[in-house]
Each structure stands twice: as structure tokens, then as C-alpha cells.
């Protein structure tokens, strides 16, 4: 199933189930009416405490009454405990950067305040001069996880979504670390919804594309990951407890602006569209804003 947070025409926030084709929605109140299940108000309780599994038993009789285009899609998981990101976790991206891939995850954390809606503007401070894009598969952790073996690591996954790891390269290179240049407010658009893990038979075989103003910039596959998702989860769980709602963004493939001979960094008004097979599409306009 696909689960989303939405805002309707009455400016009311709730959550919904998305139809298989990604075109229609069923709101929380409608789910309750059609199934008779007293589902909770909070999306985290709905997805992490077993209520979604109850609803799945009624999937065949659900009737989707509204179009996705009639609502605003919001950040799927509000206030995640942490956002863990991987650097240089694709062979093609590491090669373009002239680096040898690491056997262990190279990680950094993004602040929750960087999260952004899947179709909302990315607001870039005017002092940023080299703004870059990074399409990534994000994993949503579904249960508390500590020291999980690799062969059981995917049991901890609730689902997957797209995350755009927007990056201010000038700040990143100046600081010689990732957090400030990747942690600016709105620099993590994500969604458009969470696709539950049962719909993704092989997360290591998903096609990934990024287009800027219609021009394809990234065109790769998660099969190019250096460290696969199951090993990422296992490795992280050795040093930190993973919690329900944690987001793990698994790195980006080749094609980013900084690796070009003549870098095409993002400019004011550019539109970045990221599509990942089975996960959907997010689209964001770049808006430079003075301090």
C-alpha cells in the first residue's frame, strides 16, 4: 500500500491511502467508514502500531473517491526521530568523484527542519553559489532496531520513499563536512508517499532518474549501491538504536552537477523532478531568497 499525509481544500491535515496507480486517495475518515475499523488520528500510530495491517485485510473492497490532484501532499512522516544519510554509496557516483567506495557507511545527519513537501519550492539562501541535486531512495524504519543481523535487517523496514538531498556544494567544500551545506531549511523534499515494503520485492533494483527543466541529469539504478540497504541497516544498528519513523537516505547515483566538466548547478526558477521506480515522482522549483 501507499500511505500519505495530505492537506485538503479546507486546509485540514490528515492521512490517506493512495490507490495502486497513484491517482486517487482514500482519507482517514473514509477508511474508517468503509472498514469499520476505529483507526487513530495520528499517522505514526496508524502505520507503526498495526492499524495499517488491519486495513490491508479490507483492501479489495475499498473505494477511492478523490483525486490526488485535489489535495496537497505533505511530508509523509512528521518529525522523524532522525534522518541518517549516506555519502558516496553508489559506485558510479564515487567513480565520478574520484573516490574509492568505503566498505562501511559514510554517514551524516540532516536536521528535521530540512524536510520539505514533495511539490513545494526549495528555498535557497542567496549566499549559496553552487546548489546541487541528489536523488535518493529513503528507507522508513518501522520498529525499534538494535544490532540486527544483515539477513534480518529488512524486517525492520516499514517502507520506502524518495528523498531529494539538496546540497550547497560551496558550503560543503568550505566546511569539509556535510551537515551545514545539506541541512538548510527545505533542503530535503520527500515523498510523494510511503510505499510499504511488501510492494517492493527488490529495493536493490529500482530505476532512478532526475530531470532539471526536462533535461535528464541522473539515470541509474539502485543496483549500483555500494552498500545494500540490508547491510546499511545492520551496520547502523550496531552503533545507534533505530526507531520507528527514522529515515535512512541511501545515497545518490552519478550525474550530479559537481561531477560535470562544466557543472550545471541549479539556478533560481529551475524545476527538479525526481522519479524512482515504484516510489513515484517529486517535483520542486528552486527559489533563491535573500536573507
Q: What are the residue ranges of the model-derived segments?
A:
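Structural signature of FAD isoalloxazine-binding scaffolds in flavoprotein oxidoreductases
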Residues: 101-118, 133, 267-278
Amino acid at each position: 500500500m501507499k500511505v500519505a499525509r495530505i492537506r485538503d481544500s479546507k486546509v485540514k491535515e490528515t492521512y490517506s491511502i493512495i490507490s495502486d496507480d497513484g491517482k486517487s486517495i482514500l482519507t482517514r475518515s473514509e477508511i474508517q467508514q468503509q472498514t469499520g475499523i476505529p483507526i487513530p488520528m495520528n499517522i505514526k500510530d496508524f502505520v507503526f502500531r498495526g492499524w495499517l495491517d488491519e486495513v490491508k485485510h479490507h483492501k479489495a473492497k475499498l473505494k477511492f473517491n478523490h483525486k490526488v490532484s485535489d489535495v496537497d501532499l505533505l511530508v509523509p512522516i512528521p518529525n522523524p526521530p532522525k534522518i541518517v544519510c549516506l555519502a558516496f554509496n553508489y559506485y558510479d557516483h564515487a567513480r565520478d568523484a574520484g573516490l574509492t567506495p568505503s566498505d562501511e557507511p559514510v554517514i551524516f545527519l540532516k536536521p528535521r527542519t530540512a524536510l520539505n513537501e514533495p511539490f513545494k519550492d526549495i528555498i535557497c539562501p542567496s549566499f549559496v553559489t553552487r546548489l546541487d541535486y541528489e536523488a535518493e531512495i529513503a528507507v522508513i524504519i518501522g520498529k525499534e532496531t538494535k544490532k540486527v543481523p544483515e539477513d534480518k535487517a529488512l524486517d525492520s523496514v516499514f517502507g520506502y520513499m524518495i528523498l531529494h538531498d539538496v546540497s550547497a556544494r560551496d558550503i560543503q567544500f568550505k566546511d569539509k563536512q556535510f551537515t551545514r551545506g545539506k541541512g538548510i531549511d527545505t533542503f530535503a523534499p520527500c515523498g510523494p508517499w510511503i510505499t510499504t515494503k511488501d510492494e517492493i520485492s527488490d529495493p536493490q533494483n529500482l530505476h532512478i532518474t532526475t530531470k532539471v527543466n526536462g533535461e535528464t541529469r541522473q539515470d541509474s539504478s539502485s543496483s549500483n549501491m555500494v552498500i545494500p540497504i540490508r547491510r546499511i541497516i545492520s551496520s547502523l544498528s550496531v552503533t545507534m538504536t533505530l526507531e520507528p519513523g527514522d529515515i535512512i537516505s541511501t545515497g545518490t547515483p552519478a550525474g550530479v552537477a559537481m561531477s560535470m566538466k562544466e557543472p550545471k548547478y541549479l539556478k533560481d526558477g529551475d524545476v527538479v523532478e525526481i522519479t524512482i521506480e515504484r516510489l513515484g515522482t517529486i517535483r520542486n522549483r528552486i527559489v533563491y531568497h535573500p536573507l
